[in-house]
């Protein structure tokens, strides 16, 4: 009996040690600044030593500079230690060094050139790695087929595959979703029509902008849609995600729920002088010659629009890219139309380019609105309703406005919670598959019709 008790204690002790074993981050070919943003903070139970595998070049050096800036800043400095492998065989090297138990306890972070990203995802899943990938996880129909295989493989190998959906952390988006779940305020989501959709979302982005306080120098391949992906298959992923996440909370969806997809695409012209400011390069590389509009301008197909119905809810999504903006930054517009009120996010000049949330009553009294808002005030202390002519502004305390760069850490926090349970919410995988079904099918349709 005594020996049996000792054995049980040893097993329990080993289980606790195993459960507390730190997670290892692996960064693969970090060509996009999002790869660094997930390390903008430290995490509990994560090893500060990060293995980085990449080819030699500016992408890698820029990534390491960003990590160093986080480590050396005066406020809340991080303590990351980057162990770097440079070489053309970086991917094969990563697979060899991340086998077995090491793989199960690791998170592979993918944010860079999208040309081979889906292939990397599939092979990493085959090797038993947990994967957190920046959007998009695929940029065309061929990639979508690989992605479907990757999700099947991840399930078979009992690992997680997840994409970085930062917009779910934006407080105006969170509260918009919350308000649409309150029947006393919102009523029911309208069905809408193709001409007057129930859900409309538009995001505007800029090639030249500031990140972490410095001008963002983008890699030359970012301007090549065959490597980065067209706008309709890239940033549009966020908008498709928000539409289904907001309208069908915690509901598993499939391609059978989608009807009447139409799509269009158009380019943003980028002059050589603008290209030089964006990338730091004086000439267009050879791989962009195919996109030349004339000797000094390329066309970048970064803009797109998708219209479709999701379980009968008419939805319109637009993703736009401009060169730069004299004021403000990327902007977001979203409206969800209910039978009692519309809930709208605006981020224009009138809002001083800060996203603001509005309730526009249609069939609800002021008393009903204020009463219905009370429970939300308890859940998010400090939010208030302020009347602005015929609509209401939801005043949001600054404590909730953590900012886009902080959202990457918040996504990682959620992913680490999922990894601790070794399980994603039931609806996440089918809805990720639907998301990329929509974007890749829309791209194919847009190319056919243009």
Report each predicted region and the residues it spans.
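Rossmann-like dinucleotide-binding domain that binds NAD(P)(H)
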Residues: 213-316, 320-328
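A contiguous active-site-proximal alpha/beta segment in oxidoreductase catalytic domains
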Residues: 138-215
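Sec/Tat signal peptide C-region and signal peptidase I cleavage site
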Residues: 15-19
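N-terminal glycine-/serine-/threonine-rich beta1-alpha1-beta2 phosphate-ribose binding loop
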Residues: 20-127, 142-161, 417-420
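Short helix/strand-capping hinge loops at secondary-structure junctions
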Residues: 128, 134-137
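A structural signal for well-ordered alpha-helical segments within the folded catalytic domains
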Residues: 58-61, 115-118, 122, 145, ...
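C-terminal helical cap and adjacent loop that interface with cofactors, partners, or active-site loops
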Residues: 234, 239, 244, 251, ...
């Amino acid at each position: 009996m005594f020996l049996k008790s000792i054995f049980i204690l040893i097993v329990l002790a080993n289980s606790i040690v195993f459960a507390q074993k730190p997670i290892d981050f692996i960064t693969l070919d970090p060509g996009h600044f999002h790869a660094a943003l997930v390390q903008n903070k430290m995490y509990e139970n994560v090893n500060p030593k990060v293995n980085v595998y990449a080819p030699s070049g500016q992408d890698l050096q820029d990534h390491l500079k960003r990590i160093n800036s986080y480590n050396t800043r005066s406020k809340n400095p991080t303590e990351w230690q980057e162990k770097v492998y440079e070489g053309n065989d970086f991917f094969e090297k990563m697979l060899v060094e991340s086998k077995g138990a090491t793989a199960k306890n690791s998170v592979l972070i993918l944010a860079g050139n999208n040309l081979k990203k889906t292939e990397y995802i599939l092979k990493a899943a085959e090797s038993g790695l947990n994967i957190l990938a920046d959007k998009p996880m695929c940029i065309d129909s061929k990639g979508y087929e690989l992605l479907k295989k990757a999700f099947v493989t991840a399930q078979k190998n009992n690992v997680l595959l997840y994409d970085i959906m930062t917009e779910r952390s934006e407080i105006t988006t969170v509260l918009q979703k919350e308000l649409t779940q309150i029947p006393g305020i919102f009523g029911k989501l309208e069905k809408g029509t193709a001409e007057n959709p129930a859900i409309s979302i538009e995001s505007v982005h800029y090639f030249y902008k500031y990140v972490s306080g410095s001008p963002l120098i983008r890699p030359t391949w970012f301007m090549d849609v065959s490597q980065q992906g067209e706008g309709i298959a890239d940033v549009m992923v966020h908008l498709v995600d928000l539409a289904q996440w907001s309208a069908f909370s915690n509901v598993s969806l499939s391609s059978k729920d989608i009807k009447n997809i139409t799509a269009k695409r158009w380019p943003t012209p980028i002059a050589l002088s603008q290209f030089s400011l964006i990338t730091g390069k004086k000439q267009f590389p050879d791989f962009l010659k195919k996109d030349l509009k004339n000797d000094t301008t390329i066309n970048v197909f970064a803009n797109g629009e998708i219209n479709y119905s999701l379980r009968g809810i008419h939805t319109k999504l637009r993703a736009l890219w401009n060169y730069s903006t004299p004021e403000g930054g990327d902007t977001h517009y979203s409206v969800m139309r209910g039978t009692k009120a519309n809930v709208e996010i605006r981020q224009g000049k009138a809002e001083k380019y800060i996203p603001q949330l509005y309730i526009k009553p249609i069939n609800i009294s002021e008393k009903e609105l204020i009463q219905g808002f009370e429970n939300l005030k308890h859940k998010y202390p400090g939010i208030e309703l302020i009347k602005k002519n015929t609509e209401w502004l939801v005043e949001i305390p600054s404590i909730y406005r953590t900012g886009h760069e902080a959202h990457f850490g918040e996504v990682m926090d959620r992913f680490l919670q999922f990894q601790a349970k070794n399980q994603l919410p039931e609806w996440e995988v089918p809805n990720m598959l639907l998301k990329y079904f929509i974007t890749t099918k829309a791209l194919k349709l847009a190319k056919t019709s243009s």
